[in-house]
Amino acid sequence: VGSEMCIRDRDEVFSISYDETKDLEEKTLFNMVSAFANLQNGTTTRSNATSFKIVKESFINKEGEFKKQEQATRAINNDDITSKICEIEFSNGSSIGRAIVSANANFPALIAFIPKCSSEKMMEQTGASKLLHASKASYLYNTIKMKEAVDSLRLPTLEKISKELEIPINEVSYEAVKNYITITDAEPTTRSTAVQIGDIEMQIYHDKSIFPLVKTNWGQEDPYNGWFSNIDRDGLRDWVRTQDGGKNFTSVPAGCVNIAMAQMMTYTHCNKRPPVAFLIPTGKYEVQTGMTFIPNWDQMTKTPKLDDPGAGGIIDAQRLILDLYIENKTTSKKDWDNAVISSEVSEQNMLKTMNKYFKYQAKAAFNGDMAWAALRDKHLVLMLTSDHAFIISGILVTEKAISTRELVKRNDVYWHANLGWADECTGFYQLDSNANTYFQANAVQEWAHKMDYLNNIYAK
């Protein structure tokens, strides 16, 4: 090989490094999760991932998700990509977390990172399972687009390198020429210190990332619905289904819409002047005095959760949540045995309350570029699925490389989703709004995941 230096952009380098290799080893996948967890130590969602194990494996391609590789590859053409997806459980202090990782050596990715996920049932209840489906679809869409780039660039790149280095084209490979390549399109940007764990190097783009604006991590049960038992009003206490399948007569869940609104207010309304006063909730037989209170936002946000050591403003938070529960005309959804399984708010009632307290853009299909612009302006995003509402208030842009192919760096974008179930399933998820458009246009219903949002939310 001659001594000339080839100048290449990232996509060209990727096209010649693409190789039908076997899947990444377990150790590399664990290193990827560990590196991502270590990056979090500079953010609000501090994590320490240890003792990893793979709890579930599946194979995804554009035809769907399959338990066995043979089923997956039978469903598609030879040219199509099938990626092995691993769900990795890790211990994170006293709780169990979960990471979703692609083991495809050509397209390795950490698809979602959830510091606390206690069960599959909790994934369903919080809406995280739908969000994960959207994350997998986003990953799949990006691999399809990258493979298209590989297919179009590979031969022209091989020909150029062969000509520049004066070697036969059949001798050009990533391994043979990597020491002669300089990448020119790496953008100058502020990064954190790189985290190197085993064979994975990862870093955060600080000037592109926005750490979560909403600092609370509230839930729907005790202590958040604590004021429900203090006043006599129909529907606030009932037989409620428990996690283990039993039922208790207790306060009903606060509802994800009410928790989302209350948590957004801790950010949007904390510095509002004059401050907004809320009605002190009263019982059905009490005289309606019209007395109000102004929440002490500083006290309420002293700690992420209201049951953390040193938490403050608990009564204000409980009153605010009940006030929103009443204002949103929240109702109980019951199962076959007449036990409450969730608290629901109609879209009409939600928008009426949103209009009272917030300014925002009209409901629309999720658009990643517009959501990112809102976060840059320090405004919030409320995501809406058919039966869940959750806050996006941060975005994380990372760059990773595997030491065997250190020139092939990939950027990943993660949205910080606060699902309103205390710590459960709140975390970082890949979401690409182009994925849904692409799969719908190609009539691939399996990966279509329509998600609406209210964008650019701030105090009225």
What is each of the regions a protein language model found here?
Residues V1-I7:
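Short, small-residue-biased leader/transition segments that mark boundaries at the very start
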Residues R8-Q40, T250, A254, N258-K363:
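Cysteine-nucleophile protease catalytic domains, especially the papain-like/related folds used
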Residues V13-A75:
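Short, non-transmembrane alpha-helical segments in secretory-pathway proteins
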Residues F14-Y18, S34, A75, D79-A194, ...:
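Noncatalytic regulatory segments and standalone regulatory/sensor domains
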Residues K62-T73, Q220-N248, T282-P309, L407-V408, ...:
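Surface-exposed intrinsically disordered loops and tails
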Residues Q69-S95, K352-Y414:
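Active-site-adjacent substructure of cysteine-protease-like catalytic cores
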Residues A105-F107, V397-T398, G420-E424:
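Acidic glycine-/aspartate-rich tracts in secreted/extracellular proteins
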